[in-house]
């Protein structure tokens, strides 16, 4: 009779990362928060969809706040204290996500807007008529 395979614990090790970079991608439909170390390796991440919101509610500021709190909680468990914040996109969850990171106990040293702006590249989609 075959023996069942032994289940091993999580392969992720709890590493001590004191400084990091928070990437907030805020679109009109969702907000994604990724927290990386200074080398760019992801320590924790969360999004409005992963926090349990569906559909149009993913684009709300409250959903962005919930996602940022969840990502910050996991980063704090791994010893993160100081962060730089890079914000990308035009969404409504930008400010609330930054505020949630600060309330969670992370010290913000820098906030930078890295939204890509075209120097008249591709043609824009046609206007939506409702």
Swiss-Prot record:
One of the record's GO molecular function terms: structural constituent of ribosome
Keywords: Ribonucleoprotein, Ribosomal protein, RNA-binding, rRNA-binding
Presence of keyword Isomerase: no
SUPFAM superfamilies cross-referenced by the UniProt entry: Translational machinery components
InterPro entries named among the record's database cross-references: Ribosomal_uS11, Ribosomal_uS11_bac-type, Ribosomal_uS11_CS, Ribosomal_uS11_sf
Listed GO CC annotations: ribonucleoprotein complex; ribosome
Signal peptide start-end: none
Pfam family, one: Ribosomal_S11
Subunit composition and interactions: Part of the 30S ribosomal subunit. Interacts with proteins S7 and S18. Binds to IF-3.
Function: Located on the platform of the 30S subunit, it bridges several disparate RNA helices of the 16S rRNA. Forms part of the Shine-Dalgarno cleft in the 70S ribosome.
Family: Belongs to the universal ribosomal protein uS11 family.
Name of the featured protein: Small ribosomal subunit protein uS11
